[in-house]
Regions:
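N-terminal extracellular ligand-recognition/capping segment immediately after the signal peptide
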Residues: 8-66, 74-84
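Extracellular beta-strand-rich, repetitive "passenger/adhesive" scaffolds
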Residues: 34, 42, 72-79, 100, ...
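Extracellular beta-strand solenoid repeats
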Residues: 38, 46, 68-70, 81, ...
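Right-handed parallel beta-helix/beta-spiral solenoid domain characteristic of secreted/periplasmic
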Residues: 47, 58-110, 284-286
Length: 313
C-alpha cells in the first residue's frame, strides 16, 4: 500500500502513521500490512507525537506494520527533524528509510529502544544523517531482536556529538542483532565508539566499500565487543584519520578479516590496534581531496572506499 503524504502535512506523529496503517488493514482485512509513505521532496517534517499529558512523545510504528519512509524524487531529499525518537516496539517484518535526510533536533537518539521488539530488517538507503548527539541505534531495555541492520549508500556526519554514546550501541544482554551490514557509505566524524556491544552480533559485522574519517574519539573504540565473539569483516574500505592518537581499535574474541582495504598513516589506534589492518604510508590528506571540509574524493586511483568518492576516470 503506497500513500503519498499531502503537502500540507509537516508533522509525522502516531496519528498520521496509524491512520495510514488502519486504512491498509481495513482494505486488506489483515493485521500485518506493508505500507510505503511517500514524503514530498524538499519538505521538512517534524518527527514527534504528543502524550496524553500534552508532552512530546516518541513516534511509534503500529504493531504488525512494515513501513517504508520513502523520499520522493525532486531537487532535494525530504528532511526528517527528529524531535523525539522512533519506537520500534512490537513485531515488524521491516522498517525502512529511503532517500531522506535525518537530523537530531532534540531526539538525541534515532532509536533508543526500551520495550520488546522483533524486527526483520531495519534499513537506511540513500540517506544522510547529521548531528546526532547520541546513537542511531541503541537498546536500553526490553527483549529486542533484529535480524539485520543495513546502512547502504548513506553519509553520516558529526555523529555521537555529545561524546556519551556510540553510533551503534547494543546496550543490553537481551538484544539479539543477527547482522550489521554497512556498505557504500561514508562515516565522517564520530565522537565516541563507532560500535559498542553488550551482546555479540551473531552473524557478525560486515563493512564494505565505506569511507571513514575522523573516526573514533580518544579512549573510544572502532568496535568494542569486549569478551564477546563478534566477527568483523572489512572489504574495499578506507579508514582515514582517527580523531585522537589515544583512540582504540577493535576488541573481540571473534575473527577479524580485512580484504582490499586501506588504512591511512594518521589512523592511529593507541591501543587495541587492528593488527590485521596495518596503517599505510599515505596520510588522509594524501588520499582524499579536502577531508577537513568533507570532500573525500580520492586523489589516488584505487577504487576503494565509498564509490561516491572515486576519482573520475
Amino acid at each position: 500500500e503506497k500513500v503519498e503524504l499531502d503537502p500540507s502535512i509537516t508533522t509525522i506523529n502516531n496519528d498520521v502513521i496509524a491512520n495510514i496503517v488502519t486504512a491498509a488493514q481495513e482494505k486488506t482485512g489483515k493485521t500485518n500490512v506493508a505500507i510505503t509513505i511517500g514524503l514530498q521532496a524538499g519538505q521538512t517534517y517534524t518527527m514527534v507525537s504528543t502524550a496524553e499529558d500534552g508532552t512530546d512523545a516518541n513516534v511509534k510504528i503500529p504493531e504488525g506494520a512494515s513501513v517504508t519512509f520513502f523520499g520522493l524524487a525532486g531537487e532535494s531529499k525530504p528532511v526528517l527533524n527528529w524531535k523525539k525518537c522512533l519506537d520500534i516496539a512490537g513485531s515488524h517484518a521491516y522498517i525502512r528509510f529511503q532517500n531522506v535526510s535525518m537530523k537530531d533536533t532534540g531526539c538525541q537518539y534515532l532509536i533508543n529502544q526500551d520495550k520488546d521488539a522483533a524486527v526483520g530488517e531495519l534499513s537506511f538507503t540513500d540517506c544522510t544523517f547529521s548531528g546526532f548527539e547520541s546513537s542511531v541505534f541503541r537498546t536500553k531495555g526490553g527483549v529486542v531482536s533484529v535480524d539485520k541492520i543495513l546502512v547502504d549508500n548513506c553519509v553520516m556526519t558529526n555523529m555521537s556529538t555529545g561524546g556519551g554514546y556510540p553510533v551503534f550501541y547494543i546496550g543490553t544482554t537481551n538484544t539479539n542483532l543477527v547482522k550489521l551490514e554497512l556498505k557504500n557509505s561514508t562515516f565522517d566524524t564520530t565522537s565516541h565508539n563507532f560500535i559498542q556491544l553488550k551482546a555479540a552480533i551473531s552473524g557478525g559485522v560486515t563493512i564494505s566499500d565505506c569511507t571513514f574519517y575522523n573516526n573514533v574519539a580518544g579512549s573510544k573504540y572502532f568496535m568494542d565487543s569486549n569478551k564477546l565473539s563478534t566477527d568483523l569483516t572489512i572489504i574495499r574500505t578506507v579508514l582515514g584519520m582517527s580523531m585522537d592518537a589515544a583512540a582504540k581499535g577493535v576488541r573481540t574474541t571473534g575473527s577479524i578479516v580485512i580484504n582490499e582495504s586501506m588504512r591511512a598513516k594518521d589512523c592511529v589506534y593507541g591501543s587495541n590496534d587492528i593488527k590485521e589492518f596495518a596503517a599505510g604510508s599515505l596520510t588522509s590528506d594524501e588520499i582524499f581531496t579536502d577531508p577537513a571540509n568533507h570532500n573525500f574524493t580520492m586523489k589516488i586511483d584505487d577504487r576503494i572506499g565509498d564509490p561516491r568518492w572515486y576519482k573520475a576516470e
